[in-house]
Amino acid sequence: MSSEQVKDRAKAAIVGSLVADAATQPVHWVEDPNRLNEQLRNKSEPEFSSEWLNPRYRYDNGTFSIYGEQNYVLLKHLVENKGFNLKKYMDAYYRHFGPGTNYDQPQSRDRLPKQGPWRNEHITRALNKIQSGDQRSGTDVAECDSYAMITPLVAMYAGSGQLDSYVDHVVRVTLNNDRSVRTAQFFAKLLEHYILHGRDPEGFHKVLSHFPNDQYKRDWQTAYEERSMCNVDAVRKYGYGSSLPGNFQGALNCLTRNEDYVSSVRTTMRSGGCSAARSCGVGAWVAAQYGSQCIPSNWISRTLRGREVLEYASQIIRMMKR
């Protein structure tokens, strides 16, 4: 495969992840499958829904969820710094999500929906340690942010041999938890495979074979091999929430559908729960296989920072560390 094809797939992964997140956010966190099905039943194009169904918060259509926003912060850091620097990344993260920002607003599950963006509790706890300079400032919980936010890092360092180390550093800033790190590393290695090699029906098993035979691996394999189960049922089985392994298992099940980019994202959003995080992952995996042409231009234009993401992604591929 030519270097230009690899670069196009890396760019597609970045854009595909963030656009999928924005497209999904209006239906994020709907955990009642009957309600979601009723609302979307007659909508052949549920993306960027003008009817905001998200029960936790209200925000502008076309913006990113907390998962996409972390993804964007990492993307911007990599471009501005011309690569990853842990201290500078921690500073950028704190400035974006910390005191005085739109994310620094009172929120309570007793008073929903919140007006404005949502900040996950483990991020709030991690911010205090980030300020102190603790490089493993994250909370010891297994959450889907770990894989949903790292696509730009994979795109820049695909094929470099440095990916595992960088993923470990990035994830532990907010999630100092082994399952979070290992899940992110597997997500990254599978995405790296698609970026470097394109579509490969055996890609999952090839990447999985390089991981130790432990419970993490068994969880991923179980989800992938239950391909006869539709994604709605898989998400119901593995859980609607943001915790791991369930959220990641729901994303893996969607990958087995072998659908195109648009169909994959729509399948994800129709399955409910913490769908924005799953869309970040599925959007990256599928876009990396099909290339940048698979992402609809009108989806990019409906993403409020879509043009900015395109420009940042173009800069990333010029700096790929292969």
Swiss-Prot record:
It comes from the Eukaryota. Pfam families: ADP_ribosyl_GH. Transmembrane segments: none annotated. GO terms for molecular function: structural constituent of eye lens. Gene3D superfamilies: ADP-ribosylation/Crystallin J1 (1.10.4080.10). Keywords: Eye lens protein. InterPro entries: ADP-ribosylglycohydrolase, Ribosyl_crysJ1, Ribosyl_crysJ1_sf. Expressed in the rhopalia. Present in both the large and small eyes. Belongs to the ADP-ribosylglycohydrolase family. J1 crystallin subfamily. This is Crystallin J1B. It comes from Tripedalia cystophora.
